[in-house]
């Protein structure tokens, strides 16, 4: 007698490797909004998102390409850029009335000191409330770009000063 197929076809986004539904379910049922951090080959993208039945809603967003407006001259995909993008997102979220969120790194590997955690550190230092463990955050030297300036002084010798000036410009937006 026929019983049908003995296999199960996974959801399309799971088959494509784009969504971890187990992790998404845990994040969606939380009462706080999510701070979503995604890295591309050229940029870091941070968003504050809430889940609704019609679809997720983005309340605040920041892209590392916007750092040029604040005087940042370094790469838009490194650890200092992630730190500054997280800080920019937090400043915008605080101005919009958001006070906290839960970190959502998607399918990115949770390696201590990774760029997604640099964005978290920037948001926390700007005054945004996100639960986290201090051990996963990158060192201050990495967020300021001192490791890049040490490695390539001819190209990025002034990066720590540039990051500090950009932090001042971003925090000036809060006032």
Swiss-Prot record:
In terms of Gene3D superfamilies, this protein maps to: 3.30.420.100
Query: Would the keyword Iron be found if you checked this record's keyword annotation?
Result: no
Q: Which GO terms describe its cellular component?
A: cytosolic large ribosomal subunit
InterPro entries in UniProt: Rbsml_uL18_euk
Q: How does it assemble?
A: Part of the 50S ribosomal subunit. Contacts the 5S and 23S rRNAs.
Family recorded in the similarity comment: Belongs to the universal ribosomal protein uL18 family.
Please give the name of this protein: Large ribosomal subunit protein uL18
The GO biological-process annotations, alphabetized, read as: ribosomal large subunit assembly; translation
* Gene Ontology MF terms: 5S rRNA binding; structural constituent of ribosome
Q: What does this protein do?
A: This is one of the proteins that bind and probably mediate the attachment of the 5S RNA into the large ribosomal subunit, where it forms part of the central protuberance.
Q: Which PANTHER family match?
A: LARGE RIBOSOMAL SUBUNIT PROTEIN UL18, RIBOSOMAL PROTEIN L5-RELATED
Pfam families for this protein: Ribosomal_L5e
UniProt keyword annotations, A-Z: Ribonucleoprotein, Ribosomal protein, RNA-binding, rRNA-binding
Alphabetical list of NCBIfam families matching this protein: PRK08569.1
């Amino acid at each position: 007698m026929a019983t049908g197929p003995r296999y199960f076809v996974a959801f399309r986004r799971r088959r494509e490797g784009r969504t971890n539904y187990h992790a998404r379910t845990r994040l969606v049922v939380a009462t706080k909004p999510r701070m979503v951090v995604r890295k591309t080959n050229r940029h870091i993208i941070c968003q504050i998102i809430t889940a609704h039945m019609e679809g997720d809603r983005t309340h605040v967003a920041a892209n590392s390409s916007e750092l040029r407006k604040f005087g940042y001259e370094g790469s838009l995909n490194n650890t200092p850029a992630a730190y500054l993008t997280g800080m920019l997102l937090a400043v915008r979220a605080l101005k919009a009335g958001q006070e906290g969120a839960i970190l959502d790194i998607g399918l990115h590997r949770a390696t201590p000191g990774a760029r997604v955690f640099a964005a978290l550190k920037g948001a926390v230092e700007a005054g945004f409330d996100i639960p986290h463990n201090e051990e996963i955050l990158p060192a201050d030297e990495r967020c300021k770009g001192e490791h890049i300036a040490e490695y390539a002084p001819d190209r990025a010798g002034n990066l720590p000063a540039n990051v500090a000036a950009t932090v001042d410009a971003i925090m000036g937006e809060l006032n």
